From Swiss-Prot:
Homodimer. One of its GO terms (cellular component) is early endosome. InterPro entries: Mg_trans_NIPA. The keyword Membrane applies. Belongs to the NIPA (TC 2.A.7) family. The chain crosses the membrane at residues 5-25, 57-77, 80-100, 106-126, 145-165, 185-205, 223-243, 256-276, 289-309. Pfam families: Mg_trans_NIPA. This is Probable magnesium transporter NIPA8. GO terms for molecular function: magnesium ion transmembrane transporter activity. Residues 1-4, 78-79, 127-144, 206-222, 277-288 are extracellular. Its main location: membrane. Residues 320-330 have a biased composition (Low complexity).
Amino acid sequence: MGEWVIGAFINIFGSVAINFGTNLLKLGHNERERLALQDGGGKMPLKPIIHNQTWRVGILVFLLGNCLNFISFGYAAQSLLAALGSIQFVSNIAFAYVVLNKMVTVKVLVATAFIVLGNVFLVAFGNHQSPVFTPEQLAEKYSNVTFLVYCGILILIVAVHHFLYRKGEVLISTPGQEISSYWKMLLPFSYAVVSGAIGSCSVLFAKSLSNLLRLAMSSSYQLHSWFTYSMLLLFLSTAGFWMTRLNEGLSLYDAILIVPMFQIAWTFFSICTGCIYFQEFQVFDALRTTMFILGMMCVFIGISLLAPDDTRGNETKDNSSSLDSIVSSSVPTEEDRLIPQSSEDGHSKDTRVVVQGMYMKAADLIAKTKTACLAALGFGEDSINASAILVMPMVSSKITGFRGNGLERAKILSMRGSGWSKLAMEEEGTRMLEKTISSKA
């Protein structure tokens, strides 16, 4: 049995464990909310989720799955494992049905069939080699002309889509400007492409680290080297970027659009990066290339079919729009808050308010960054079904939807529309600020 088979099985078990863990995390949050309703009628504050036994088991299974996926990259090709990670969608359906008692529709079954069929093609015709590289060989591959050209193209793609995204933001923020359906589709697409292109590099660095770990176990190679630490730093940076963009993107856009875009972009760039860097395409002939591409198309079709219902997305969007208007009308703008109470000490009060506002803004950004990093591990007040860094996170499906609540989305949209000049503060922060102004008046 080839080593690629071992890597494939480890990856499958890891993906299944990740999905089982995330469903247990979701179940733990549901149990906590149900107990809060039973004990205090929903008025009592929720206990920390870490006290829930189901959640603790879920986080252990989740971490075990991530470790298995990390190990698997040392035994099989990146292009194979990146595509094979889509098997988690199949296991998620089964676990959501058994653990969360969710309904499985015909559309979900059809999507599952496409994903399974695509994975059969990918496994049968993918790269079956699993060589172990030395640090010198890995470093040499980073200076390969083909890989450098690919990196240049990748940077160009990221720059173009980032420019388009910023241009679209300017058009949206312009008062009275009509936004065409073209820009409404291009904005989330550009956001997903930038996120997937950079975030998928975490798979490359993870495979390099896994390769070094495997080399250290089979020889006298010492992990204590500049190359190992460089790979670790790059992995943490790209993985952190991916998780942050993933969390933010799901709060900004309807899941029916952004979910399949995220998943397809991440998988596509992960496969391309592995094929170019490790030169995995060299073993492909015309037949294997055709069947591998066909398998990828089947997987992408299946992922697209797993997007949430349009009706559900519209309902959420309508609710978000109404909440956005509520938040916008209830939270005073910066200009309203910074009106001086008197002409004598207006300047000093204005300065104090601005300084306090800047401080609260910085604290809010730090809190959001911390939340984004911990969200994928299930920590925090809200359950988030992000599954892994090394495989495409199971962020949303018809079974276990992953969307920020409407109030969070409204706050973010309000902040994005107002810009830096208008400080977007939470309600508690606003009350504290107004109280400070009145006490010093």
